[in-house]
From Swiss-Prot:
Residues 1697-1719 form the DRBM domain. Its main location: nucleus. Changing D1217A: Unable to unwind blunt termini (BLT) dsRNAs and fails to rescue loss of RNA silencing activity in mutants. No effect on binding to BLT or 3' overhanging (3'ovr) termini dsRNAs. Changing K34A: ATPase-defective. Unable to unwind blunt termini (BLT) dsRNAs but is able to bind BLT dsRNAs. No effect on binding to 3' overhanging (3'ovr) termini but abolishes binding to BLT dsRNAs. Residues 1653-1722 are annotated as: Essential for efficient and high-fidelity siRNA production and siRNA loading. Changing E1617K: Loss of RNAi silencing activity. Decreased processing of dsRNAs into SiRNAs. No effect on mRNA cleavage. Residues 1520-1609 are annotated as: RNase III insertion domain b. The lineage of its organism: Eukaryota, Metazoa, Ecdysozoa, Arthropoda, Hexapoda. Residues 1268-1362 are annotated as: RNase III insertion domain a. Residues 713-855 are annotated as: Platform domain. This is Endoribonuclease Dcr-2. A motif (DEAH box) lies at residues 139-142. ATP binds at L28, P29, T30, G31, S32, G33, K34, T35. It comes from Drosophila melanogaster.
Length: 1722
């Protein structure tokens, strides 16, 4: 906003001068510019505003009493200064801000404006010290008495360092609170002592008059009216009806209503629904008595609207009923009133009752006088000259008088176009619920209209007095009696123009009293003036001893060693805030239970000294760490006793570590930080800490690792005179021989093979599968090597040259920058050809090596040359490799047959039968060939050799007979270039790169196998020791991998056509139950035209439809009412209710089968022992079931899916993942048994987080052995014994910064000569310097800033691996161990990876012997006490299929947090934490063992379909376990029964209808507080979304509305998980636990395995019309929000999903969207 220049008036400057020197309370009457004084003071004290606090910077506080005032003052400061202003009120959720957020705010802003409590907390929690403030301005400071935060704030001054205190400036227009108009002087003295300064105003009378000119002095008028005597019969009748209703209301039972907390937690909202109803009726009676029947007929409509909305919002049926009864009564009353009004008119038309005559006749004298005054004052005036305020006492009166005036003005011609009324009420609702958001919006527009002059008569409830700035008014009417001095001063202060009138209405009888009162008020005003006149600016400041005495209190504040202060009066709020951090579902409200002790109890505990005093006890909620009862000290009154108890409880919580050093409940982050050194200290060396918030950019930054070659391949280059080992490589075809495959079949099986020659011995390696175009082959590396000694350096040189020739000339895997590496470093071994020598022994084929130091270059020849050469001989061509030089390519071909019977002049076969071979060749290539010399010689038949070099996956190319025949080519030998290289060796070479690469990773896998076996002490087992024979590598057939003809992988997506997800509507019963499940609708943000009518302002014309609309709007149900009428049953029956389900669980008709089975019967008796044991569990129990962990399994575990092999880590990772969660759960539950479930879950999620696993695996030094890159030999593979020039390679070691700018183009420019590449291994100096220059030039060219690493890394042994892959590897390795060695051994591996640290006396192998300890289980309880809670528990045990030995576990598993009576065990949360992990692990193990054909993605879907909350809830209900839950919450039981009815209609099956019901997690679980996790760029967007959420009626805070949208209560699934944990803890036998689970889940295990339910995101994406778009996630503290925009009925709709991580939030958004679509598709 542009700066508004306001000129200071003389007296303002003098006040500021005084304030510069000392504290003061500025007293200036309303309208004389206090705010401006404050702004001048801020400017005087701003010298250190722009320094940071650390270097002596200062800040200013501006404290206000209410949110509206604070908002107004913040705007004023921003308008008139250039300071950075921050605005803070409780509603923004500042209570939950972290220290980091506060320090950012304090760093950023210089003047902090806000409400008092916020600043009080800010200083007590040491976010800012008093010494860092230069000035504190306190607006409306006369409130600072008693325990008001203003006074509490000033109390802090007494315990702070006295030399560094800020200046205190109070501002007020009245010096006295309310009506305390006696002994003004003492009151004022106290005020001065509180604020440590004098009241100051302007010094002499002349100035005082001056202020009075500026300030307000209206003419005061008093209008009296006769007291009304007669009471109409109708009034009596109505009063009697209401009395009667009260009696029946008291008898109604509406169940236990959950207690709702306000934002500040100071007071309870909604404590009694009944008293709310009574209050409305009492209000109505008051209106009728005070303003007459006509007014009453308007007031009753307000009630009807209110009750109708409440009825629709009612959470339980009984509450609905209560509001319905009230509604009926209102209708009746309205009828009586309207009838009475119609007595005066002659017809029954409603409209005729709104005449001036009727209004005057049926109003009380007071209203009559008021209307007369209006008429007299304003008749036929110019509306622009009128600015009138009418003050009334009650909120409802505003609406009522507003309605009355509208009709009166309409029916009075003189006023019709003159007055335009509006009304405004104070805000009483603390909850920022939907209605108050609308309300505030409407209020704002009301004030705006008044300011703009569109409305010129404003009716306000007296709350408007303080500070809400409505411009100068010339008429103020006070309709109701003035109650307090301040009200008088301030409402009078509203009349600000010089000829203003201030009109009071009073009854004749009260006239004297009122005059008396007004006189007293004026006298008080004068007293104040006297007090000030006597001591204007010469007064002495209050002495220190006066201040000390003034703040003396019953309880001393507690200061801890960090200097933070715990004020007794803050203790209650802290306690409540602490309870809010205790985890609970939407229905368990956790609050401390206060109890006033009876005398006998009190005397027993405190003895005689406590006689006549009050003692209060506090019990914390069931799941809090503090289990003991806390007693207050005996106090004089209940209030201080309560404070004392809360104060003591806070001190205990502080000592237990539940409050942090600032006395604020510990956040999850702080709790994690407190154990970071125990579990996460290894993060530090990677520059990370577990509490650090992750910046998105850093989080995704993947690390680069130095690859490590297997030990056996390092420094293994053969040397002269030393023993070397040659390991022969055998290829065995696994396909049938036929015309097409024959050449391959025969050539692979010749005795000539290759071997790898090296100085180290190799372990036994598993046989590996490869896939050629002809089919599958097996590759075996010989177990026993050939031992050889190289005699001389000539032989060694020959071996080197042949090795280089193989890769350079035949395989062509050679970049111009490669050199032969003779240093014997990584992968230093040679490839040698073997031949069958004398005595059938294999030996080196020296002859071949001698002949082929280099492969001859193919070249053509002209006719003369061919005439001079000898004629070709058949024996030279048999089995050799040739190439057609005259065709345009240099393709090697294998000669498969020599046709002696054919000549070039023979006729061709097949389609060219009319030509000879000679004619055909000449016609195509004649001009290149010239002619054929030897026309009478033989012909050769050749086959193309594949160019592919990767053979890991099956090539799914389709070969039909025609293309196979085409493979057969007949050529003229004289026109071919013959390499003379043996065809079988050439053919075997093609497979070599794939084999060598696979051996490389197999050796790594073998090393891991040995390493783990040794650690676990299993290397001595016979099958793991020296006799270990690896099993052949297994192909995971579920990974349907496809390749194109070149061997590149084609990703497989079995993409089906998008299909509509509808199926026929099953039965009437579903349709009925669906109608009850109101799945709420959100359309966001609402457009203006969708906003409901402002009911209060259109009371008289509101129709039921609008009420219905308002209700649907307020709960977010805006649906097109006309298009979709829920009640229209036929409409539903004719349609299908859209959601996909197949023929689930056989075709039983739902809901019929079990109609006559009693509720508590088991669904089916379970027989022990018929469940197939899980292999993993057998291995856990005994060693004889252990199987060796195979080399191939370790290989799979280090192979990422990105490597595109026929096996990878994903399947093992599913098992490892669930094992990891299980072990982390058991470990934390036993190590920190007294933590609450929220903290356990948080630490667990950090323990199993990808970041933690990443650091653990790096610590174990495994990442460098992973296979994560698809094998492409020609582009990203360094063959053995080959490297970059050594001097170039050194750059990476010696100058890593420079190495970053080396690009692949620079390497290609290296153009090495043969001398450099094959002999020296270094590049020449000229070349080298040119190369370095070229790299430097990259900085200037368009390569500047490019990242070459991905293209260059393979040459220098570096690899970049995604962090997630590394975490998955760790899980997969654990999976290998669990699968083969069982749980105990796998627990030991956790210590190996340092994921868990064992305690001295608790080795990790004993994790399964978990003791549930902690303070939560009371020992020595007898069974009768337990069974007192467990009614009919044998039915439960029968249905569960398990009988408990110790029923304490059972009791704990059934106790909901809302059940305060059970103090024996605590609630089920701890068990649920354990049960969740046990269930997840056992189900994962089962599907892992039983679904080998299912791909990993489907396995994951299957697992989540089985263990998600909805499925658990269905199973819980199907087994009738919900009857036994111990909870005290009407809302919860109603939602459960709603869900049970729905499930019965579904035949208790988990259908897809059920799967999209909303769970609690889908409805926003925690308040969205702005935590530092938020990416700053997304902040405005997130805020917008959050505020839209708020407007939409999803309150952004607390539990206000959350539970209304839940269809599936989390409690059902939680109880089932808790019962599973209870079974395990009771029997300590996982196999027995599995039997129980299997019997519960059997129908789903079979059904879902048959047809895996696809997850909601895919379901949405595959929907025909939806076209969903998901937003990127917005992180908010512990919550993530994802929005999803999709199309439904041609409209774009946006929904929001919440969850604890990105995937959950996305799933939840998809669910919301599917629910919408399910309606639209109908």
């Amino acid at each position: 906003m542009e700066d508004v220049e306001i000129k200071p008036r003389g007296y303002q400057l003098r006040l500021v001068d005084h304030l510069t020197k000392s504290n003061g309370i500025v007293y200036l009457p309303t309208g004389s510019g206090k705010t401006f004084v404050a702004i001048l003071v801020l400017k005087r004290f701003s010298q250190d505003f722009d320094k940071p606090i650390e270097s002596g910077g200062k800040r200013a506080l501006f404290m206000c009493n209410t949110v509206e005032l604070a908002r107004q003052q913040a705007m004023a400061v921003r308008r008139c200064t250039n300071f950075k202003v921050g605005f803070y009120v409780g509603e923004q959720g500042v209570d939950d801000w972290t220290r980091g957020m506060w320090s950012d705010e304090i760093k950023k802003n210089q003047v902090l404006v806000g409400t008092a409590q916020v600043f009080l907390d800010m200083v007590t929690q040491t976010y800012v010290a008093l010494s860092s403030l230069s000035v504190v301005i306190i607006d409306e400071c006369h409130h600072g008495t008693g325990h008001h935060p203003f006074r509490e704030f000033m109390r802090l001054f007494t315990i702070a360092n006295q030399t560094k205190l800020p200046r205190v400036v109070g501002l007020t227009g009245v010096l006295i609170k309310g009506n305390e108009i006696t002994n003004v002087a003492t009151k004022l003295k106290e005020l001065e002592i509180t604020y440590r300064g004098n009241i100051i105003t302007v010094s002499d009378t002349k100035e005082m008059e001056n202020v009075m000119l500026y300030a307000t002095k209206p003419t005061e008028v008093m209008v009296s009216f006769p007291h009304q005597e007669q009471v109409l019969t109708v009034t009596r009748l109505i009063s009697a009806e209401i009395e009667k209703f009260y009696v029946s209301l008291d008898l109604m039972n509406i169940g236990v209503q959950p207690i709702r907390r306000s934002k500040s937690l100071q007071c309870l909202r909604d404590p009694s629904k009944k008293s709310f109803v009574k209050q409305l009726f009492n209000d109505f009676l008051y209106q009728m008595k005070e303003y007459g029947i006509y007014a009453a007929s308007i007031a009753i409509i307000s009630l009807i609207v209110e009750f109708d909305i409440k009825r629709r919002q009612a959470e339980t049926l009984s509450v609905k009923l209560m509001h319905r009864t009230a509604l009926t009564l209102c209708e009746k009353i309205r009828h009586l009133l309207v009838q009475k009004l119609q007595d005066m008119t002659y017809d029954d038309d409603d409209d005729n009752v709104n005449t001036e005559e009727v209004i005057m006749n049926f109003s009380t004298p007071k209203v009559q006088r008021f209307l007369m005054s209006l008429k007299v004052s304003f008749a036929d005036k110019d509306p622009k000259d009128i600015c009138c305020l009418v003050f009334v006492e009650r909120r409802y009166t505003c609406k009522c008088i507003y309605g009355l005036l509208l009709n009166y003005i309409q029916s009075t011609p003189e006023l019709r176009n003159v007055l335009t009324p509006q009304f405004m009420v104070g805000r009483n609702n603390i909850s920022p619920d939907f209605e108050s958001v609308l309300e505030r919006k409407w209020q704002k527009s009301a004030i705006q209209q008044f300011r703009d002059g569109n409305a010129n008569l404003m009716i306000c409830s007296s709350v408007l007095e303080e500070g809400i700035d409505v411009q100068a008014c010339n008429h103020v009417f006070i309709l109701d009696p003035v109650k307090t001095f301040n009200m008088y001063v301030q409402s009078k202060g509203r009349a600000r123009t010089t000829e203003a009138k201030f009109v009071l209405f009073t009854a004749d009888k009260e006239r004297e009293k009122t005059i008396q009162q007004i006189y007293q008020y004026r006298k008080a005003h004068n007293d104040i003036a006297e007090y000030l006149k006597d001591r204007v600016l010469e007064k002495t400041e209050p002495e220190l001893y006066e201040i000390k005495g003034h703040f003396q209190d019953d309880i001393d504040p507690f200061t801890n060693e960090n200097g933070a202060v715990l004020l007794p009066n803050n203790a209650l709020a802290i306690l409540h805030r602490y309870c809010q951090t205790i985890p609970t579902d939407a229905f368990g409200f956790v609050i401390p239970w206060f109890h006033v002790l009876q005398e006998d109890e009190r005397d027993r505990i405190f003895g005689v000294s406590a006689k006549g005093k009050h003692v209060i006890s506090i019990n914390m909620p069931v799941n809090c760490m503090l289990r003991d009862t806390i007693y207050s000290d005996p106090m004089d009154n209940v209030k201080t006793a309560k404070i004392s108890a809360a104060f003591k409880a806070c001190k205990v919580l502080y000592s237990l570590g539940e409050l942090n050093e600032r006395f604020v409940p510990k956040t999850l982050k702080e709790r994690v930080a407190s154990i970071a050194d125990v579990h996460f200290e290894h993060w530090n060396k990677y520059g990370d800490s577990v509490t650090a918030t992750v910046n998105k950019a850093d989080k995704s930054k993947d690390r680069t690792y130095k690859t490590e070659c297997p030990l056996e391949f390092y420094d293994a280059l053969p040397r002269v005179g030393e023993i070397c080992y040659a390991y022969e490589i055998f290829l065995e075809p696994q396909f049938e021989s036929c015309e097409y495959t024959e050449h391959m079949y025969l050539n692979l099986q010749t005795p000539r093979n290759y071997a790898i020659l090296l100085r180290n011995k190799l372990p036994r390696l598993a046989e590996m599968p490869l896939f050629s175009n002809q089919g599958k082959l097996h590759v075996r590396v010989a177990n026993a090597p050939l031992e050889v000694i190289i005699q001389n350096s000539e032989q060694l040189e020959l071996l080197h040259q042949f090795h280089g020739m193989v890769f350079r000339d035949i395989l062509k895997i050679w970049h111009p920058f490669f050199v032969l590496d003779r240093r014997s470093k990584e992968n230093s071994y040679l490839v040698v050809p073997l031949i069958l020598g004398a005595g059938e022994q294999k030996c080196f084929d020296w002859e071949l090596m001698t002949n082929f130091r280099r492969l001859p270059q193919s070249h053509g020849s002209n006719v003369q040359q061919r005439e001079q050469q000898p004629a070709p001989r058949p024996e030279d061509f048999e089995g050799k490799i040739v190439t057609q030089w005259y065709a345009n390519y240099d393709k090697p071909m294998l000669v498969t047959k020599v046709h002696r019977e054919l000549t070039p002049l023979s006729y061709m076969e097949k389609n060219q039968q009319d030509k000879t071979y000679y004619e055909f060749t000449m016609s195509k290539y004649g001009n290149r060939i010239g002619d054929v010399v030897h026309k009478d010689k033989f012909m050769i038949e050749v086959r193309d050799l594949t160019e592919q070099l990767t053979f890991y996956v099956h090539n799914r190319g389709k070969f039909n007979a025609k293309s196979k025949a085409k493979m057969k080519v007949i050529l003229i030998p004289e026109l071919c270039f013959n390499f003379n290289f043996p065809g079988d060796l050439w053919l075997k070479l093609i497979f070599l790169p794939s084999i060598l690469n696979r051996m490389y990773f197999l050796l790594h896998a073998e090393a891991l196998r040995k390493r783990f076996n040794t650690y676990l002490n299993l290397h001595l087992l016979p099958f793991n020791g020296t006799d270990y024979m690896p099993r052949p590598l297994e192909i995971d057939y579920s990974l349907k991998r496809n390749v194109d003809p070149l061997g590149n992988v084609i990703p497989t997506e079995d993409i089906e056509e998008p299909k509509s997800l509808l199926e026929p509507m099953p039965t009437k019963s579903i349709e009925a139950s669906v109608a009850n499940l109101e799945i709420t609708e959100f359309e966001n943000p609402w457009q203006k035209y969708m906003e409901p009518v402002d009911l209060s302002r259109n009371l008289l014309s509101t129709y039921p439809v609008e009420l219905d609309y308002y209700y649907h709007f307020s709960v977010g149900n805006v649906c097109e009412m006309n298009e979709m009428d829920f009640e229209d049953k036929e409409y539903w029956a004719k349609n299908q209710f859209h959601m996909p389900t197949g023929n689930i669980y056989g075709n039983r008709t739902p809901a019929k089968t079990n109609a006559n089975v009693p509720a508590l019967m088991p669904s089916k008796p379970t027989v022990r022992g018929k469940v197939k044991p899980l292999l993993i569990l057998q291995k856990t129990v005994s060693k004889e079931h252990i199987t060796p962990a195979e080399q191939g399994e370790f290989l799979a575990a280090i192979t990422a899916s990105s490597a595109a092999d026929v096996f990878d880590m994903e399947r093992l990772e599913i098992l490892g993942d669930s094992f990891l969660k299980l072990s982390a759960t058991l470990y934390l539950a036993s190590k920190y048994s007294d933590w609450n479930e929220g903290t356990l879950t948080e630490v667990k999620s950090k323990l199993v987080s990808n970041r933690n696993l990443l650091f653990c695996l790096i610590d174990a030094d495994i990442p460098k052995t992973l296979n994560t890159i698809q094998f492409t030999p020609r582009y990203t593979w360094l063959p053995p014994g080959i490297s970059l020039p050594h001097n170039v390679l050194a750059l990476w070691r010696e100058n890593p910064e420079f190495a970053k700018i080396i690009g692949p183009h620079n390497l290609r420019d290296l153009a090495l000569g043969d001398e450099e590449s094959l002999v020296k291994g270094n590049c020449s100096d000229i070349n080298y310097n040119r190369f370095v220059e070229g790299c430097r030039a990259n900085g200037q060219s368009f390569y500047a800033g490019a990242d070459f690493s991905s293209e260059v890394n393979f040459c220098v042994g570096l690899v970049t691996i995604p962090n997630k892959v590394i975490a998955d590897t760790l899980e997969a390795l654990l999976g290998v161990i669990v699968k083969n060695y069982g749980l105990q051994h796998a627990f030991k591996m956790l210590e190996y990876f340092k994921i868990c640290r064992a305690d001295i006396d608790k080795p990790l192998t004993q994790l399964l012997n978990l003791e549930l300890g902690g303070k939560k289980m009371r020992a020595n309880v007898n069974t009768t006490e337990i069974d007192g809670f467990l009614i009919n528990h044998y039915y439960l045990e029968k249905n569960l299929g398990y009988t408990f030995k110790d029923r304490r576990y059972l009791l704990q598993a059934l106790t909901h947090p809302s059940y305060p009576t059970n103090r024996i065990t605590g609630s089920y949360q701890e068990l649920e934490f354990i049960g969740d992990a046990i269930l997840d692990f056992l189900i994962s193990a089962y599907i892992f063992e039983n679904n080998t054909k299912m791909n990993p993605g489907a396995l994951t879907d299957l697992r989540s379909a089985l263990v998600n909350n909805t499925t658990l809830a269905c199973i819980c209900v199907r087994h009738r376990l919900h009857f036994f839950i111990l909870a005290e919450n009407a809302k919860l039981s109603e939602i459960i029964s709603k869900f049970v009815n729905f499930q019965e209609s579904q035949g208790h099956r988990v259908t897809n209808y059920v799967r999209i019901l909303l769970e609690e997690a889908d409805v926003q679980p925690t308040p969205l507080d702005l935590d530092d996790e938020l990416d700053m760029t997304e902040l405005p967007h997130a805020n917008k979304c959050i505020s839209q959420e708020a407007e939409k009626g999803v309150p952004p805070k607390g539990e206000f509305n959350m539970s209304t949208n839940v269809d599936v209560p989390k409690a059902l699934g939680d109880v089932l998980e808790a019962l599973i944990a209870a079974v395990y803890l009771d029997c300590r036998d996982l196999q027995r636990t599995w039997e129980v689970i299997f019997n519960l889940f059997e129908p789903e295990l079979q059904e879902f395995t048959r047809k895996v339910p696809i997850n909601h995101i895919r379901q949405l994406v595959e929907h025909k019309h939806a076209k969903p778009v998901f937003s990127s996630p917005i992180v908010e503290g512990e919550t993530v929000m994802v929005s999803c925009q999709f199309t439904c009925m041609e409209k774009t709709i946006k929904v929001y999903g919440f969850g604890s991580n990105k995937d959950q939030a996305k799933l939840s958004a998809a669910k919301h969207a599917l629910q919408q679509l399910s309606k639209c598709d109908a």
